[in-house]
Amino acid sequence: MVETELDTKKIDFLPDDMLEAAAECLKGMAHPVRLRMVNLLMQGEFAVHEIAELCRTSPNQTCEHLRLLKSHGFLSSERRGRTVYYKITSPQLPGLIQCIRKNCKC
């Protein structure tokens, strides 16, 4: 059998569990509206109606996107009276947004 360069080279793959976690994280973020919401929430806490207005989405769409982001552990919510406020709880999100800003020059 002939030995190739690839056989002798050590390939540095990320561990499978890390790749699975990254794919799940990116899947949760993989929508322009969700990215816009995260970008907004990096600037502070906002009520659902404020997020809807600033992100130019309907209240129903806003709630669905926020629900998904929260289910992935990116956000937390707090009800105060009749208003629900959201904020970022994931320490990884600011770095992800910075990476997008730096590398996605379209």
Question: Where are these predicted regions, by residue range?
Answer:
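A short acidic, leucine-rich amphipathic alpha-helix
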Residues: I51-E53
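Conserved segment of winged-helix/HTH DNA-binding domains
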Residues: A22, L26, Y85-C106
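Residues within helix-turn-helix
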Residues: A47-H49, N60
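N-terminal leader segment of winged-helix/HTH proteins
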Residues: M1-M29, C99
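Helix-turn-helix DNA-binding motif, specifically the short coil turn and the N-cap/start of the second
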Residues: S58-Q61, T89
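Beta-hairpin "wing" of winged helix-turn-helix
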Residues: K70-R80, K87
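Short capping segments at the starts of secondary-structure elements
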Residues: P32, Q43-A47
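Pre-recognition alpha-helix immediately N-terminal to the DNA-recognition helix
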Residues: L35-N39
